């Protein structure tokens, strides 16, 4: 598919087809003759995010165990019937990407809150949008005040690093700068104690943070930092910007590194960050992203 503007979501389907989210459209595109080009392109929905908005808007397309294709930061998710795809209304939840555990619970996050869980399917609350409280849906598993990150380099290039107490004495951030892409590790090629545990990326601080889930025995989950003081992956390179993690077929997982100096969407950049970017030439050298 060519001439897409800011495509932000992609889901491979059978029969050489795929779902492609390119605001404002969600396409169902198929390669009918095997030349790796989309010969057919059907618009399933024309309300998939807004053009020109990078940081906010529909994304995800995570295929859950209940056959729902979950969408984050949007007011519907996608379902399939004998007649094709259709949307189902939900409450607006999450910011960037989605994961699921072995029990089918859906996880999201937002900004500096690393992990939320749906104990209850959002379909039930969507039956009555007049409900004020939606307990059990998008439940916050760890408070910001209880979570700490440990970058291995000073991180002055944060959007609000000018604030008092934003940085430690060594110049590193103590809390998330912009967490996204929660992933429950469900593979078998990492140590057993990590299996079933959540990881989140925090590209502004150049790291991937490992959390641990605990169950109180009554089905209530809580999250905590896996390491008292440390990270599973961290870099001294300011351009290391992990933005996504994907489970791999071989029991490991892939890391998508945007590898660029700027990680904050321009309309939301503070004057402090704009000056920092200009002083350090961080807007230069684009198109160097990589996969681990």
Feature names for model-found ranges:
Residues 1-292:
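Beta-propeller domains with acidic blade repeats across secreted/periplasmic ectodomains
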């Amino acid at each position: 598919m060519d001439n897409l503007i800011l495509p932000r979501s992609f889901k491979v389907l059978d029969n050489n087809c795929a779902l492609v989210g390119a605001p404002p459209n969600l396409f169902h595109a198929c390669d009918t003759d095997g030349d790796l080009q989309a010969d057919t392109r059907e618009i399933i929905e024309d309300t998939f995010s807004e053009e020109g908005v990078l940081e906010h808007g529909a994304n995800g397309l995570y295929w859950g165990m209940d056959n729902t294709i979950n969408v984050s930061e949007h007011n519907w998710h996608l379902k399939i019937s004998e007649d094709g795809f259709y949307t189902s209304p939900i409450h607006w939840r999450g910011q960037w990407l989605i994961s699921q555990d072995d029990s089918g619970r859906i996880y999201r996050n937002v900004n500096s809150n690393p992990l939320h869980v749906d104990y209850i399917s959002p379909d039930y609350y969507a039956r009555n949008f007049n409900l004020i409280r939606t307990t059990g849906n998008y439940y916050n598993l760890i408070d910001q005040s209880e979570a700490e990150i440990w970058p291995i380099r000073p991180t002055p290039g944060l959007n609000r690093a000018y604030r008092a107490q934003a940085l430690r004495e060594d110049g590193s951030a103590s809390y998330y700068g912009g967490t996204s892409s929660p992933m429950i590790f469900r593979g078998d090629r990492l140590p057993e104690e990590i299996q079933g545990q959540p990881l989140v990326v925090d590209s502004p601080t150049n790291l991937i943070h490992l959390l641990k889930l605990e169950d109180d025995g009554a089905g209530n989950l809580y999250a905590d930092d896996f390491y008292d003081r440390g990270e599973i992956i961290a870099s001294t390179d300011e351009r290391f910007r992990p933005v996504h993690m994907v489970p791999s077929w071989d029991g490991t997982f892939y890391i998508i590194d945007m590898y660029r100096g700027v990680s904050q969407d321009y309309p939301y950049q503070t004057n402090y960050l704009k000056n920092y970017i200009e002083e350090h030439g961080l807007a230069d050298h684009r198109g160097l992203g990589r996969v681990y």
